[in-house]
Amino acid sequence: IYKDQALVNWDTKFKTAISDLEVVSKDVSTQIYYIKYPSSDGGSITVATVRPETIFGDTAIAVNPTDQRYQSFKDITFTIPLTSRTIPLVFDEYSDPEMGSGAVKITPAHDFNDFEVGKRHNLELLNILNDDGSLNDKCPKDYVGMDRFDARKKIVKALKDQGFIEKIEDYKTTIPYGDRSNTIVEPYLTNQWFCNAEELAKQAISVVRNGETEFFPSNWEKTYFQWMDNIQDWCISRQLWWGHRIPIWYDESNTPYAGFSEEDVRKKHGLKGELRQEDDVLDTWFSSSLWTFATMGWPEKNEKLNLFHPTTTLVTGFDIIFFWVARMIMMTKHFMKEVPFKEVYITGLIKDESGQKMSKSKGNILDPIDLIDGVSLEELLTKRTEGMMQPQLKEKIIKQTKKQFPEGIESYGTDALRYTFYSLASPGRDINFDIGRIKGYRNFCNKIWNAFRFIEMQVANHGYQTGESSENILSDWMGSKIFQTAENCQTHIKQYRFDLASAEIYELVWSNFCDWYIEFSKVAIQKSDDANQTNNLIGSLITNFYSILELLHPFMPFITEELSSKLADLAEVEKSSFIIEGGFAHARASNKETEQQLDEIINIISAIRVIRAENQNIKNETFNLIISNDLSSEMQSVISKNESVIVGIAKLDGIQFTDKIPLESIEKTMDGYKLIIPLEGLIDPEEEMMRLQKELADVENDIKIISSKLANEQFISKAPTAVVEKEKAKVSDAESKKAMLEKSIAKLQP
């Protein structure tokens, strides 16, 4: 660590140095000024600049040593316009002979490239700005104290009036802005503290290359190396009130001393006179780089440091890989001789639903607490418009917010929000946050509560005695589904695929458990006339639901912990621990055979429901189901054993296995066998034919009207794309319906 006079990015609003990564480059339209500098031989040379206010800081004009136009200018000096000060000509490869006149003004104290040229030619470093961006007393008195941009206008007018302007052109360029202040950043000459980062970076590069620390997704390692391979010395001092004050004390001769305190410095160096502590504070990221070990009692070696260092995983955003991640690795490797963490998981940024980065200036910030607890429109407007850096945008933000949230934001709950983020957490991708998603996961939370209420109702209606539950196909099927989901989820989580893990659990809970297992159990309990069997079915519900809660717990800790307590009370057992202390759906086992058997029964019931939907005439009828003998005898036996439950769910009169197919029937081909529904006695063929033909005629007419609209070139060219696509979808749906009706008519024809 050393102190030096150097150029830094200076934020004139906050009056502090900022790092390169805190600078945002913006494309702007400005003007470029061609200014004539009188020469000592009676002529002049023209240089171009977009910052005429910096001419008072010029200390040379540079041309390329290969530029033949200026070989005779070696001993000529130039006078800075509006002053009497002369500056030399220097030959430097920084100047491009192909750009403009080939001559550039060199202002070492106000341009990073010029600073390097100045070092090569031992030029004076002339700072002409105050820390607030106004011109200082190194400038002509007419401009002293003026804001830099006000001074620009006055200087350009004076240059024009005195004939120093050759021409002015419109010009597009990029200008640096402070990411927090949104003001133009100035290269500014100050005394700052620096950290020589090159040696530190070598170790930090090595640990990632050799796999001691890994990035997930791995493509972020490339970004890490790009920064680290081109690292510059790090300016670690800041001119702010907040932060760790730099532990340096100066004596009366301005000699610096480092120490833990003034007392430590005096004792270490035997100092008696007055000491003054450094006013600057450390860059936040310098302090933060010590986080992994400084918070654990370092430099003392203690149990906490040994236990928790290094840690396993750092979860962070890509925008602070260099700010924080790289610097933690550098510092920890230097001081602790080990890596701070073994894995770095990079999340995406959470943006608004249209993909815009959330910011106060855009008025699109969503506070997670407001999504959890809800917020009124009035409160939301206050949050989005209070203390704005750009108050002129206030009305626009109010209008936009009222349109998006006319009633404010309703309460969605913590677990619904948490699950939403899990579901959107695809590796390395930014998240476009759509409030519709959190509504869906609030419904999911309600679904879980309703599942518990169903179990609670069964216990209330039938009672429940704890004990060993005997095996049954429903419980074994559900247990196997839970087991497989748990296995898959553990794999996904190890790979940081929280989106895939949450999707699998969602499917398990909503479809397998709530839609099928509960429905099967409801019918099985209704049809049971055996108290032990009923108790067994309820016990299986409780066991499987607890396993569901274990699976859900990392994703929904609040709801699952609450429901696990209620479940224990329901079963009249003592809850011995929190879910987090238990396993990950540990009590389940795989049973592929049973799983496949009940899956096939579900396929049969689903097929019957599709047939009902496609044939409105039998939608609400009960009927016998015929299954062809192509179905395996083992599967026929399983269906027969569970016929009462299947009949109850599918609303059938009965099930029989035969190859005899009635003349009037509906057939559905399954995987290697057929489902047949006899129609005799269910419908009047003539009436049904008339109904189907009328419906077909209506559908054909709809197709004709929509197709005519889509054939109209004027409609296609003028209508919004979404409207055109909607009409195309209507045609597609109508064509599908037409095919279905024609198929039904064909079945009724002799």
Task: Please provide the spans of the model-predicted regions.
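NTP-handling and nucleic-acid-processing catalytic cores
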Residues: 1-132, 207-237, 286, 294-308, ...
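Residue patterns forming the tRNA-binding/recognition surfaces of aminoacyl-tRNA synthetases
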Residues: 1-44, 99-253, 288, 318-320, ...
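Acidic, turn-prone loop/beta-hairpin segments
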Residues: 5-24, 250, 275, 351-352, ...
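A glycine-rich phosphate-binding loop feature that marks nucleotide/adenosyl-phosphate handling sites
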Residues: 7-16, 171-181, 246-254, 343-350, ...
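Structured, non-catalytic alpha/beta "coupling" segments that mediate domain-domain communication
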Residues: 52-61, 166-197, 438-464, 554-568, ...
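Metal-dependent nuclease catalytic cores in nucleic-acid-processing enzymes
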Residues: 112-123, 156-159, 321-337, 605-612
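Catalytic cores of enzymes that engage adenine nucleotides and/or redox cofactors via long glycine-rich
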Residues: 171, 227-232, 236, 240-249, ...
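C-terminal low-complexity, glycine/proline- and small-hydrophobic-enriched intrinsically disordered tails
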Residues: 439, 566-750
